[in-house]
Amino acid sequence: MAQQQMTSSQKALMLELKSLQEEPVEGFRITLVDESDLYNWEVAIFGPPNTLYEGGYFKAHIKFPIDYPYSPPTFRFLTKMWHPNIYENGDVCISILHPPVDDPQSGELPSERWNPTQNVRTILLSVISLLNEPNTFSPANVDASVMFRKWRDSKGKDKEYAEIIRKQVSATKAEAEKDGVKVPTTLAEYCIKTKVPSNDNSSDLLYDDLYDDDIDDEDEEEEDADCYDDDDSGNEES
């Protein structure tokens, strides 16, 4: 099959996809929704141990714009989520996914917003951090934000928020079983980087071709993500 000319955004996404498949982020699995479409990714997120989300299997969709990485992608949970920074339709509200415009009313610094040096790896790490440490100052779900603050400020004595999350976690187990996925429940299991094999060798061929297009200057220097670090603000209280 003849290969079509790849756009700069497709080249960037191909490089990122290969990097994430070879050096995955702990707690995530990345696949393409369609092998022929680099602009739509499916993400499986495993709930971090020692948090309310422990044992959960949450699916999400990342959609990239044509001008990526100059504009940010969107990140939408497909799994029903009750969280201060997740809208009812699953869209995640987080600074790193906001366009790089100067908006004093938002309360966000320009440095907190998207810029072309960000990538999927930093998005994934930001999302998993957000799950455990919600931003209650600018919530997407006001009711969830109020409920979370009550749970946090009461040190777990107000259990309404925790009970909703546990029910959602429990509901994801059937989906994990259907997908044949073993969800990690210990820190040791969670820290294992699961490589997702490509369905064929087409991505390798495309990846190799990138170096024939004089894009060696696009090499990214990415630090390996440290494994999940517990934080008291999101840990379960007994």
Curated annotation (Swiss-Prot):
Region entry Important for ubiquitin transfer, spans: 98-113
InterPro entries in alphabetical order: Ub_conjugating_enzyme, UBQ-conjugat_E2_core, UBQ-conjugating_AS, UBQ-conjugating_enzyme/RWD
EC numbers on record: 2.3.2.23
ATP-binding listed as a keyword: yes
Keywords per UniProt: ATP-binding, Nucleotide-binding, Phosphoprotein, Transferase, Ubl conjugation pathway
This protein's record includes keyword tRNA processing: no
Stored SMART domains: UBCc
Pathways involved: Protein modification; protein ubiquitination
Comp. bias regions, Acidic residues: 206-238
UniProt effect for mutating E112A: Impairs polyubiquitin-chain formation. Decrease in substrate affinity and ubiquitin transfer rate for neddylated CRL2(FEM1C)-UBE2R2 complex
The name this protein goes by in its record: Ubiquitin-conjugating enzyme E2 R2
